[in-house]
UniProtKB/Swiss-Prot annotation:
InterPro entries: EF-Ts_dimer_sf, Transl_elong_EFTs/EF1B, Transl_elong_EFTs/EF1B_dimer, Transl_elong_Ts_CS, UBA-like_sf. GO terms for molecular function: translation elongation factor activity. It comes from the Bacteria. Belongs to the EF-Ts family. PANTHER family: ELONGATION FACTOR TS, ELONGATION FACTOR TS, MITOCHONDRIAL. This is Elongation factor Ts. PROSITE patterns: EF_TS_1, EF_TS_2. The keyword Acyltransferase does not apply. Pfam families: EF_TS. NCBIfam families: tsf. It comes from Campylobacter jejuni subsp. jejuni serotype O:23/36 (strain 81-176). It is found in: Cytoplasm. Associates with the EF-Tu.GDP complex and induces the exchange of GDP to GTP. It remains bound to the aminoacyl-tRNA.EF-Tu.GTP complex up to the GTP hydrolysis stage on the ribosome.
Length: 357
């Protein structure tokens, strides 16, 4: 069995919000596997999904460059050693110049970047000179570029603190619609920076993942219901336990069954059949909303729009399609956050945690 260290317990606790001993037991039961321990805690209703932000440790900046014709959008991340340098004007200029260089030369990898020429010298030498001037080690960690296809459009957004950047691409059915969609795409990028969706739509979700998340969702709701029953607060009724977690699970047969059940309810209520067609669509939409909580949490199209939280991003786009007179299909988005995926530095907390175990 893997050794369960105090640092492992602390990381799991910070990521899930679960209790110290619950985290230790979960790690023991899963032989030290962090992701399995998270899932186990969630299935027991003891913790929330681990957030990527909980593991961020690096300093630096994310930069975004969108071409003047909105056909190319590049996002890059350059790491520094301290937050102080990340606010340095020369470092900020370096990130912008590097991103523009990547885009104008259609570079595809960090290796290709280091071999390229900027201002008459190899980029590798240029970066070394910047390191010598700024006084800290600097690393171009990653970058990506999205290109617009025929009748396509791209845009981007960089959060004011430079720690989060987003680029997005959409396919439209005319250049006119593509041009009209520029501001919409920037606003959707702002939404992505705020809400951090992990997927574009429910269609991108893996069914096994959905099924596991459903178990965790039910456990979480049942745990909350248990507490609400104990408190007996009339202003906090029990949660309704959904049958499903995502539209990925809602087959035509399931939707048809839901529709038939709605018809039976309308008949029992004595509603005349001539008005059923006006009632059923709204009730079906409510059924879908109740049974797609995972989509509203993890998928861009299923999330409620930050600028109008009564509508999903999908609904906002549909409205804009009618306004612009054409189709708008989000093809891809990329969101970078400084330090995402890097391990935290080890601090002197092990003894403190060990004393509590």
């Amino acid at each position: 069995m893997a050794e369960i260290t105090a640092a492992m317990v602390k990381e799991l606790r910070e990521s899930t919000g679960a209790g110290m001993m619950d985290c230790k037991n979960a790690l023991s039961e899963t032989n030290g596997d962090f992701d399995k321990a998270v899932q186990l805690l969630r299935e027991k209703g003891l913790g929330k999904a681990a957030k990527k932000a909980d593991r961020l440790a690096a300093e630096g900046l994310v930069s975004v460059k969108v071409s003047d014709d909105f056909t190319s959008a590049t996002v890059s991340e350059i790491n520094s050693e301290t937050d102080f340098v990340a606010k340095n004007d020369q470092f900020i200029a370096l990130t912008k110049d590097t991103t523009a260089h990547i885009q104008s030369n259609s570079l595809q990898s960090v290796e290709e970047l280091h071999s390229s020429t900027i201002n008459g010298v190899k980029f590798e030498e240029y970066l070394k000179s910047q390191i010598a001037t700024i006084g800290e080690n600097l690393v171009v960690r990653r970058f990506a570029t999205l290109k617009a296809g025929a009748n396509g459009v791209v845009n981007g957004y960089i959060h004011t603190n430079g720690r989060v950047g987003v680029v997005i691409a959409a396919a439209c059915d005319s250049t006119e619609v593509a041009s009209k969609s520029r501001d919409l795409l920037r606003q959707i990028c702002m939404h992505i920076a705020a809400m951090r969706p992990s997927y574009l739509s429910y269609e991108d979700l893996d069914m096994t993942f959905v099924e596991n998340e459903y178990k965790a969702l039910v456990a979480e709701l049942e745990k909350e219901n248990e507490e609400r029953r104990r408190l007996k607060d009339p202003n906090k009724p029990e949660h309704k336990i959904p049958q499903f977690a995502s539209r990925k699970q809602l087959s035509d047969a399931i939707l048809k069954e839901a529709e038939e059940k709605i018809k039976e309810e309308l008949k029992a209520q004595g509603k005349p059949e001539k008005i059923w067609d006006n009632i059923i669509p709204g009730k079906i939409n409510s059924f879908i909303a109740d049974n797609s909580q995972l989509d509203s949490k993890l998928t861009l199209m299923g999330q409620f729009y930050v600028m109008d939280d009564k509508k999903t991003v999908e609904q906002v786009i549909a409205e804009k399609e009618k306004e612009f007179g054409g189709k708008i299909k989000i093809v891809e988005f990329i969101c970078f956050e400084v330090g995402e995926g890097l391990e935290k530095k080890t601090e002197d907390f092990a003894a403190e945690v060990a004393a509590q175990l």
